[in-house]
């Protein structure tokens, strides 16, 4: 599906004083090439009916710790000691890697397409970013 039309969507463009409007979006090789408001979509494309669902630009989260889920901790813990224990075994390192990769994917599935990490578990943020950039993992752009 190289070329397709997202039909019957409601656009939220993120501009100041934005007003939602109905439009079709023409996508070619994964890149949005046109937003069509006159109903005249190219005919050589497959169509995906959005049935009035909203479309908006990806969100940006500028303060992310991929090793955490973002929920408040019930009690204070010694994170340095915990990290040493986790990284002491192969299964612990594997679990930590999968945790970080999963939280990156959760960000993406929540509409966040770019994140800035501000501290994580050793080099797992960087390794996760590299896997995403190579197409080995689904996730947001990590800066």
Which residues are covered by each model-predicted region?
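N-terminal metal-binding scaffold of metallo-dependent hydrolase/deaminase domains
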Residues: 1-42, 53-55
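C-terminal cap/linker of serine protease catalytic domains
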Residues: 13, 130-133
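Generic detector of well-ordered alpha-helical packing
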Residues: 14, 50, 62-64
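A short local loop/turn or secondary-structure capping micro-motif enriched for an aromatic residue
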Residues: 41-44, 65
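Short, well-ordered secondary-structure micro-motifs within conserved domains or adaptor modules
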Residues: 45-49
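Metal-associated gating/positioning segment near the N- to mid-region
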Residues: 54-131
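Metal-coordinating catalytic core of metallo-dependent amide/deamination hydrolases
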Residues: 133-143
């Amino acid at each position: 599906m190289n070329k397709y039309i997202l039909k019957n969507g409601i656009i939220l463009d993120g501009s100041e004083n934005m007003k939602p409007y109905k439009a079709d979006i023409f996508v070619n090789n994964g890149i949005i090439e046109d937003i069509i408001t006159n109903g005249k979509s190219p005919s050589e494309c497959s169509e995906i009916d959005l049935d009035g669902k909203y479309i908006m630009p990806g969100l940006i989260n500028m303060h992310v710790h991929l090793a955490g889920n973002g929920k408040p901790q019930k009690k204070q813990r010694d994170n340095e000691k915990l990290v040493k224990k986790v990284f002491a075994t192969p299964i612990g390192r594997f679990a930590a890697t999968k945790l970080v990769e999963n939280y990156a994917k959760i960000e993406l599935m929540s509409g966040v397409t770019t994140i800035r990490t501000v501290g994580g578990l050793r080099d797992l943020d960087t390794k996760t970013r590299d896997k995403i950039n190579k197409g080995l993992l689904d996730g947001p752009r990590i800066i």
